[in-house]
Structures are given as structure tokens and as C-alpha cells.
């Protein structure tokens, strides 16, 4: 706003890199001085690269930490799965396509059915292999680790916005 002046409608947006393949998440907002219709225009434009969510300005740093940085978290998880597959002696040439399809298929299933907890429970047999792996996630604090990563990115976004 300071750079543009009061006579210019301003839309703040936070896209992410999956927009490059039409599967992005973009958050948008405007301030009280801008014409609210400008959000309709921005949303229409940005739906070309994925889903658009209108959020309040106060939530933008959290959006940055979750969906702006989120693709890197998913890619880091993919790297970890590939490395774990290599440690389990799977052939190197199948690891990346296998993990890519795993993530793509799981995302498609989640998009089709929703309810990530229910989907996780459906694939987890009590005392089975999946339960053993998920127990490690629980014991080593996966949820806290992810929450801390999002919080750190949110804090850094706030710091960058203040400078």
C-alpha cells in the first residue's frame, strides 16, 4: 500500500509452486481501501493455476508457512521415502517413480474422499506393518515436527514482512 498509494487497489496473494502444473494453492486478500470487486477479478485470474482461498490479512503469515512452504515439506518427505527405500535395498531406478506415484495416488484418494484420518485408519491393520511404521511417527513426534516447521516459516514470513 505504501509503495502504490491510496488510489490503487491492492491484492495480496500467496501462490505455491504446484501452480506451475495447475495444481497450486493461492491465498488472496485485500485491504479496506481496495474495491472488494478486485478480489473477484484476482480469484478468477488465479483459478487458472489451481485453487484460490480468500483469507484475512492476519492469516497470511500462517498461509505462507503452511501452503507457501508446504511443497518443500512434501518434497523433503519424498526424499526421505526415497532414501528409506534405498536403505531397504530397493533398486535405485524404481525409487523416484514409485514414491512419486505413491504421493500422487494418495493425494488423489484424499481429494476424492477427504477425511485423512479415516483413510489412514483404513490402511492400518492393528499390529500390522503400517501400524508399526506409524508408531515410529508417533513416538518420534511427527505432528510436533510438522507444526514446528510451519510455525518457523510463519515466524520468518512475519519477519520478512516487517523489513
Which residue stretches match the model-derived regions?
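Internal alpha-helical scaffold of NAD(P)-dependent oxidoreductase catalytic cores
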Residues: 3-9, 25-63, 74-112, 156
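Active-site capping/gating segments
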Residues: 11-27
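NAD(P)-dependent Rossmann-like dehydrogenase/reductase catalytic/cofactor-binding core
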Residues: 97-163
Amino acid at each position: 500500500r505504501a509503495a502504490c498509494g491510496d488510489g490503487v487497489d491492492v491484492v495480496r496473494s500467496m501462490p505455491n509452486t504446484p501452480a506451475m502444473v495447475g495444481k497450486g494453492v493461492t491465498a488472496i486478500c485485500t485491504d479496506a481501501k481496495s474495491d472488494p470487486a478486485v478480489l473477484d477479478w484476482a480469484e478468477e485470474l488465479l483459478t487458472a493455476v489451481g485453487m484460490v482461498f480468500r483469507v484475512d490479512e492476519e492469516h497470511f503469515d500462517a498461509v505462507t508457512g503452511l501452503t507457501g512452504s508446504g511443497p518443500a515439506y512434501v518434497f523433503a518427505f519424498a526424499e526421505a521415502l526415497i532414501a528409506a527405500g534405498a536403505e531397504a535395498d530397493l533398486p535405485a531406478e524404481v525409487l523416484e517413480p514409485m514414491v512419486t506415484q505413491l504421493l500422487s495416488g494418495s493425494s488423489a484418494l484424499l481429494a476424492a474422499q477427504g477425511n485423512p484420518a479415516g483413510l489412514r485408519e483404513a490402511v492400518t491393520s492393528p499390529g500390522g506393518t503400517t501400524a508399526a511404521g506409524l508408531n515410529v511417527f508417533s513416538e518420534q513426534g511427527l505432528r510436533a515436527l510438522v507444526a514446528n516447521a510451519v510455525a518457523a516459516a510463519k515466524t520468518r514470513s512475519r519477519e520478512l514482512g516487517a523489513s
